[in-house]
Amino acid sequence: MTDTQAGTTTQTQVVIYTDGACKGNPGPGGWGVLLAMGDTEKELFGGEPVTTNNRMEMTAVIEALAALKRPCRVTLYLDSEYVRKGITEWIHGWKARGWRTAAKAPVKNVDLWQRLDALVTSSGHKIDWRWVKGHNGDPGNERADALANQGVERALGRR
């Protein structure tokens, strides 16, 4: 997704809302994504029969970024401080310690953290990570939440 203006290439601005949901933790879970580029929107969702809320929050972000086919300027709204702080703050120490926490314990969800890290570092996206309070009336977050719940229903075999 690039725009060419006067012979120069600029990155397209994309707004993304992500959310994860889990019925039981662990239990059946879902993830939802709302991507918006100008007036164009795309919705994505999926689920797993046995997972955790944090894994679904991470999967939503991974699926959102993987859906972008070219480097973009991304404003990514998420209601998970675990994911936002993990990718912007904690990951540097984890990598330096061989994917271990400061307490020397293995990082939870390391498979997803490594996938997310690879997407963020190799994609060329410029990402502005913005936390939004969940279930507080933000229209984009509410839509991502509804999509995540559709993912739960799919994981349960109801969709």
Curated annotation (Swiss-Prot):
Binds 1 Mg(2+) ion per subunit. May bind a second metal ion at a regulatory site, or after substrate binding. Mg(2+) 1 binds at residues 19, 57, 79. Pfam families: RNase_H. Its main location: cytoplasm. PANTHER family: RIBONUCLEASE H1. Endonuclease that specifically degrades the RNA of RNA-DNA hybrids. This is Ribonuclease H. It comes from Polaromonas sp. (strain JS666 / ATCC BAA-500).
